[in-house]
Curated annotation (Swiss-Prot):
Belongs to the mitochondrial carrier (TC 2.A.29) family. One of its GO terms (cellular component) is mitochondrial inner membrane. The lineage of its organism: Eukaryota, Viridiplantae, Streptophyta, Embryophyta, Tracheophyta. The keyword Transmembrane applies. Keywords: Membrane, Mitochondrion, Mitochondrion inner membrane, Repeat, Transmembrane, Transmembrane helix, Transport. The chain crosses the membrane at residues 16-32, 93-110, 132-155, 187-204, 236-252, 308-327. It is found in: Mitochondrion inner membrane. InterPro entries: Mit_carrier, Mitochondrial_sb/sol_carrier, Mt_carrier_dom_sf. SUPFAM superfamilies: Mitochondrial carrier. It is a multi-pass membrane protein. This is Mitochondrial thiamine diphosphate carrier 2.
Length: 339
C-alpha cells in the first residue's frame, strides 16, 4: 500500500487519511457484501432453523419434524425454486446499509488506533505492530463499527431469514413491527451477544491478516535473497493480499461461528415466522448469551452451534479476501489523487 506522508500531528493529513479510510472501507464492504450475499442468505436460514439438519442430530423430542434445509446444495435448490434468483439477495439493501457504514467506521477507527499505537500514520509502520496490538486494535474497531450500524444488521437478519410467503414484504414493514412489538430497544435486540462475538472475530480477522502479510513479506524477502530467477518484490501482489484475506476470514469464522449462531437467535426471537420454515424462536427464549449456548447444546447438540458453518465459512473466506483487497486498492487509488 502507498503510505501517507502525514505525521501523527499533521491535522490536514489526518483528515485526508480519515476520508480515505472511510471511503475505501465503505466501497470494499459494499463490493464484498454484494458478491457474497447468496452465501449469507443460506447461512442465516440454517442458523435460525431450530430443527436438526440430520436425524442423528435430534437431541430433544419436541424439536422433531422435517427440517426445511438439510444441506447447502439442497438449500440452494429450494431457495432458487421457491423464491427465484432474487431470493439470494433477500435483505441485501439493509445489509448494504449496515456493511458500508460498518466497514467505513471499522477501517477509519482501526487506522487511528494503529497510528496511536505505532506513533506514525504511515501504513507501512503499522504492519510491524505486535500481534497483541493488532488484535486489540481490530477488536476495538469492530466494536465501534457494530455500535454505529447495528439496527441495519438486525433488519438484514430478519429479512434474510424469511422465505416465501414473506412475513415482512419491505424493510419498512419489519422496522415498524419491531418498534410496535419491542419498542426502540428492539432495534438493538441481540447487541450484547453481537459485541461479545465481534471482539474475538474482528480481533482475529485483523490480527491474522497482519500476521499473514508479515509472513508473505518475509517469504518475498527470502526469495530475493536466494536469488531465484523470477520476478520477486517485497511488496505484496494482489494475489498475495487475496490469500492473506482468505486465511484471515476463514480463521476468524471457524473460531467464532457458535457466537454468531446465538446472536442470530437473539435477533429474531419473538418475531413472526411462517410455519413452513420451522419453529420460531419465542420471545425471551434465552436469558443471556451463556444461557443461549447452553440451551442450544441441550436441545440441538454441539452441532447446533455450528449450523450453517459450511456456507458461513465458504462465504467468510472470499468475503474477507475481497474486503481487504478492495480496501487496499481503493485506498491506494485515493492516495494517488491530488487533493
Amino acid at each position: 500500500m502507498i503510505p501517507t506522508t502525514a505525521t501523527v500531528d499533521d491535522e490536514p493529513g489526518q483528515i485526508k487519511r480519515a476520508l480515505i479510510d472511510a471511503s475505501a472501507g465503505a466501497i470494499s464492504g459494499g463490493v464484498s457484501r454484494s458478491v457474497t450475499s447468496p452465501l449469507d442468505v443460506i447461512k442465516i436460514r440454517f442458523q435460525v432453523q431450530l430443527e436438526p439438519t440430520t436425524s442423528w442430530g435430534l437431541v430433544r423430542g419436541n424439536l422433531s419434524g422435517a427440517s426445511k434445509y438439510t444441506g447447502m446444495v439442497q438449500a440452494t435448490k429450494d431457495i432458487f425454486r421457491e423464491e427465484g434468483f432474487r431470493g439470494f439477495w433477500r435483505g441485501n439493501v439493509p445489509a448494504l446499509l449496515m456493511v458500508m457504514p460498518y466497514t467505513s467506521i471499522q477501517f477509519t477507527v482501526l487506522h487511528k488506533l494503529k497510528s496511536f499505537a505505532s506513533g506514525s500514520t504511515k501504513t507501512e509502520d503499522h504492519i510491524h505492530l505486535s500481534p497483541y496490538l493488532s488484535f486489540v486494535s481490530g477488536a476495538l474497531a469492530g466494536c465501534a463499527a457494530t455500535l454505529g450500524s447495528y439496527p441495519f444488521d438486525l433488519l438484514r437478519t430478519i429479512l434474510a431469514s424469511q422465505g416465501e410467503p414473506k412475513v415482512y414484504p419491505t424493510m419498512r414493514s419489519a422496522f415498524v413491527d419491531i418498534i410496535q412489538s419491542r419498542g426502540i430497544r428492539g432495534l438493538y435486540n441481540g447487541l450484547t451477544p453481537t459485541l461479545v462475538e465481534i471482539v474475538p472475530y474482528a480481533g482475529l480477522q485483523f490480527g491474522t491478516y497482519d500476521m499473514f502479510k508479515r509472513w508473505m513479506m518475509d517469504w518475498n524477502r527470502y526469495k530475493l535473497s536466494s536469488k531465484i530467477p523470477i520476478n520477486v518484490d517485497t511488496n505484496l501482489s494482489s494475489f498475495q493480499l487475496f490469500i492473506c484475506g482468505l486465511g484471515a476470514g476463514t480463521s476468524a469464522k471457524l473460531v467464532c461461528h457458535p457466537l454468531d449462531v446465538v446472536k442470530k437467535r437473539f435477533q429474531i426471537e419473538g418475531l413472526q415466522r411462517h410455519p413452513r420454515y420451522g419453529a420460531r424462536v419465542e420471545r425471551r427464549a434465552y436469558r443471556n448469551m451463556l444461557d443461549g449456548l447452553r440451551q442450544i447444546m441441550i436441545s440441538e447438540g454441539w452441532h447446533g452451534l455450528y449450523k450453517g458453518i459450511v456456507p458461513s465459512t465458504v462465504k467468510a473466506a472470499p468475503a474477507g479476501a475481497v474486503t481487504f483487497v478492495a480496501y487496499e486498492f481503493t485506498s491506494d487509488w485515493l492516495e494517488s489523487i491530488s487533493w
